């Protein structure tokens, strides 16, 4: 489905009911494209994807796994809410090589980059998770393939 998926990981498969469980727990609805990604690729390794938006370069090194990873969706949300730095309407989507996270907004699906050293100033990346995946799809770093 996505050419940026590099390698299938074992023991990370999830079911629709697990997605629904998390949606109910947080009172959110994942965008359809994100649900489809999780069902097919939860935890899979991806190519580094580098793209530029408004003269700022972004790199995507990993899509946050919904479950079963060291830095899974729920672990990140728990830490974010405990720390109180990330707005409650933002949920983790991906991260860059430096450990900074991309978040999607449940209110309008906009995607933002939040740098660890500047959490007060989210940087707008694109208007939807689908746009984010499109940016990744056409901007893979083929030098590391």
Regions found by a protein language model. Give the residues of each.
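Short acidic-glycine loop/turn motifs at beta-strand connectors
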Residues: 105-108
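Short, well-ordered, mixed-charge alpha-helical segments that flank or form enzyme active sites
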Residues: 100-103, 122
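Short, solvent-exposed aromatic-acidic interface loops
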Residues: 116-120
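Compact, glycine/acidic-enriched structural inserts
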Residues: 121-143
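A surface-exposed partner-binding patch
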Residues: 1-100, 143-145
């Amino acid at each position: 489905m996505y050419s940026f998926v590099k390698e299938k990981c074992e023991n990370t498969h999830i079911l629709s009911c697990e997605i629904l469980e998390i949606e109910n727990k947080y009172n959110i609805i994942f965008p359809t494209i994100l649900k489809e990604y999780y069902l097919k690729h939860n935890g899979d390794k991806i190519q580094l994807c580098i793209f530029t938006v408004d003269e700022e370069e972004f790199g995507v090194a990993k899509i946050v796994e919904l479950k079963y990873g060291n830095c899974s969706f729920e672990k990140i949300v728990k830490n974010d809410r405990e720390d109180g730095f990330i707005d409650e309407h933002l949920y983790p989507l991906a991260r860059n090589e430096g450990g900074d996270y991309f978040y999607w907004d449940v209110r309008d699906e906009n995607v933002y980059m939040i740098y660890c050293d500047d959490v007060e100033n989210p940087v707008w990346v694109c208007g939807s998770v689908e746009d984010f995946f499109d940016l990744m799809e056409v901007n893979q770093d083929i030098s590391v393939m």
